[in-house]
């Protein structure tokens, strides 16, 4: 019975995906088809209704839309721009300044919004214009933004870790958050290393002149409210 249901799910899912049906609808239809094909109709209807209700009543899921909403509000409020300026003030002298700035800002923005897609959209849109003006390859810029935004999936608060906690049967969200810091930071550092190596190879230089401590102080003060949100989101 279990093998039959699995085969039905796979067959219906593949057919629907091949026909271009959105993934969410394809998964829902294939799951319902498997239930209807393996148990009585009345029981199938009750089972589908019960599982739908249980899935929608998980309180932890409410954190995900609120984190995304917070990220969008912060983006509209200019937080992403202040974070970009702050990271640029620190890492701007390195080869490929815009690449490493993109990576560092994605890590910080992901730690605020909990969403890799929000970080990629907010930070990438600001980095893109400057990268085009300075002659960066758009493919390299886009790849750097996409790869480094994944640190937002690991550095808490993470929507992916919340979803994993629910899917795994109640693994502690706090424990997952604590376990996500080191991998997220390591991923960001690895992206920085690759970004610098690419910059050296392609001839992308850092900002000219000496390190500007005054500019760093100004950018830090401007970004301080944004940086404090990392602690607020975790609390």
Which residues does each PLM region occupy?
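Alpha-helical transmembrane segments of multi-pass membrane transport proteins
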Residues: 1-235
